[in-house]
């Protein structure tokens, strides 16, 4: 089985690439969807978030208010508190998923789509976890693919996705800038990657790059 990490900054188009790879035959798991599942009531991550951040992050229906939690993390200076809770559980779940894929199909191309493949190791080191195998991307993946795009284009894409009707796009763009500050720049990610896809044109061009990538992964 080939273990592939697919990453890129907010608004880069990595989710689109993940969709193309799934169509081509890859097994794909999305870190965002996995993170949402881990934050559901009854999950250990949910309980720890409520313990650390307090009941104000819980809506009347018992679910986490993800916007309030994100504001505390990104604007309130508590991103490391959140990452300390979520990242280890998310990576462990990704590893379990890969093990399940291998049992089903030892020849599979298993793709983890995550914005923070490099950042989780950086953040672990900031917490003093110098030798953690769990977060070492070199050991987690056989290949790493980075999707890049100009920052202005990333921000515009994010704002359009968050506010498709147009209202609130300025606030969404400001939010994107805050989030991007916490992500490793494209140039640094690209220097570490095995493959780089440049998402500066239309989806047809990005799909063509993805097809070429798929052929290399399967070679």
Where are the regions a protein language model picked out?
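Glycine-rich phosphate-binding loop of ATP-dependent small-molecule kinases
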Residues: 1-64, 104, 215-219
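Phosphate-binding beta-loop-alpha motif at adenosine-nucleotide cofactor sites
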Residues: 29-30, 193-205
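N-terminal polybasic phosphate/anion-binding patch
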Residues: 31-40, 55, 150, 160, ...
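ATP-dependent small-molecule kinase phosphotransfer cores
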Residues: 36-110
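ATP-dependent NMP and nucleoside kinases share a basic, alpha-helical "lid"
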Residues: 95-104, 110-160
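C-terminal accessory "lid"/substrate-recognition subdomains
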Residues: 102-105, 177, 181, 185-191, ...
């Amino acid at each position: 089985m080939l273990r592939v990490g697919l990453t890129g900054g907010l608004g880069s188009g990595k989710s689109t690439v993940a969709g193309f790879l799934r169509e081509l035959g890859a097994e794909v798991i999305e870190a965002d969807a996995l993170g949402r599942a881990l934050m559901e009531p009854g999950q250990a991550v949910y309980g720890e978030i409520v313990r650390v951040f307090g009941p104000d992050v819980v809506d009347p229906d018992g679910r986490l208010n993800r916007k309030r939690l994100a504001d505390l993390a990104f604007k309130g200076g508590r991103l490391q508190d959140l990452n300390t809770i979520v990242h280890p559980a998310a990576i462990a779940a990704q590893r379990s998923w890969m093990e399940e894929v291998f049992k089903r199909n030892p020849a599979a191309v298993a793709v983890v789509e995550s914005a923070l493949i490099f950042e989780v190791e950086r953040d672990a080191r900031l917490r003093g976890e110098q030798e953690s195998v769990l977060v070492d991307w070199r050991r987690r993946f056989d290949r790493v693919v980075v999707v890049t795009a100009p920052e202005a284009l990333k921000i515009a894409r994010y704002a359009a996705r968050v506010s498709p009707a147009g209202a609130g796009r300025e606030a969404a763009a400001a939010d994107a800038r805050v989030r991007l500050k916490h992500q490793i720049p494209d140039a640094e990610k690209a220097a570490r990657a095995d493959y780089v896809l440049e998402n500066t044109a239309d989806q047809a061009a990005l799909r063509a790059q993805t097809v070429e990538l798929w052929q290399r992964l399967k070679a």
